[in-house]
Amino acid sequence: MDCFKFSISENELVAMPSGALWWPAQSILCVSDLHFGKSSRLARMGQSWIPPYENQDTLLRLETDLDSTSAKKIICLGDSFDDNEASQSLPLDELLWITKMQAGREWIWISGNHDPSPKNLGGSFLHYLEIGKLYFQHIASADDRFEISGHYHPKIRVIIKGQSFTRRCFLVDKNRVILPSYGTYTGGLYCNRDPLRSIMQQNAIALMTGKEIYPIPISKAN
């Protein structure tokens, strides 16, 4: 697995190809926008029908990342559930899967715009979290602080040898990191368009996910 190491406020962080962020010194794995229950919410609203397997796929990738890092703490950066009802209607096997992953580690749910209410799923529920100089919350702010967030589902499009590729990506500048969506069924916003273009500093880079991480200046995105 080819990851990408970088530093924010003298803290070494690791962007993983899956879209997870690993903080080795603190043994913290951070993921954002899992959006459990999206297919069931769309079905309830009669908007669309997509195969109801996204939870299992997302949980399997998360379990793989937890196993590979042996993380002692996990931070879910908001929109872990597609709505508040989704957190109450997970199938029993998926609830047990989450419970199994929570065993022996600290688990923190950060509130998001899709899931602002506490969950009865174990772990802690917070609106934000500060660890040292790093501030974890769902949506990036305009404050001049070192910040880890999600929400926007950033993606990047590049043209290589005449072929167009679109992938989820991390966005990184000297003050902040915006994580890609980790959930299976999620759309995204192009990193070189507003509001992301306005949020990130001019020298920001995108870390394109896939089988390995590719760093690309946002200015080079198509």
Positions of the model-derived regions?
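Extended recognition/assembly regions associated with phosphoester-bond processing machinery
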Residues: 1-77, 81-222
